[in-house]
Amino acid sequence: MTNYVKKVSIEDFGCQFLHTAHWNNRLRTTGGRFFPNDRHLDFNPKIYREFGIDIFRKIVRHELCHYHLYIQGKGYQHRDKAFKELLEKVDGLRYTPRVTAVKVNYHHYSCQSCGQVYRRRRRVNLRKFACGYCHGRLIESF
């Protein structure tokens, strides 16, 4: 990953990338992140898998705009004029395309006494928890 970012940095910016770049599977709504404290970059592998190398390269350019402007002591945030100009110059993406959402599986529970229905992402220990309305016994329903 770091080698690819170094290559893009030299080809598109004419400057070296001297730090590290990593894949980060926990990223959901963003294509990448720049960390000013230690100057490393994180990238979302889902963007690469779903949209391919062309879109991913534009996201790498976007994060490298943050990186190089920070190193030069210029405005590196999205609202700064220097950032917007450099991003347009290197043909980086302003916004990340939406990744298709992963379907979340829910667990359904109902109360035996009052019939109250609960929907939860995480499983509930049926021996430990009861209905919040009538304190009746919960059962798993499908």
Swiss-Prot record:
It is found in: Cytoplasm. Its cofactor is Zn(2+). Residues 4-138 form the SprT-like domain. SMART domains: SprT. GO terms for molecular function: zinc ion binding. Zn(2+) binds at residues 62, 66. GO terms for cellular component: cytoplasm. InterPro entries: SprT-like_domain (IPR006640), Uncharacterised_SprT-like (IPR023524). Belongs to the SprT family. This is Protein SprT-like. The lineage of its organism: Bacteria, Bacillati, Bacillota, Bacilli, Lactobacillales.
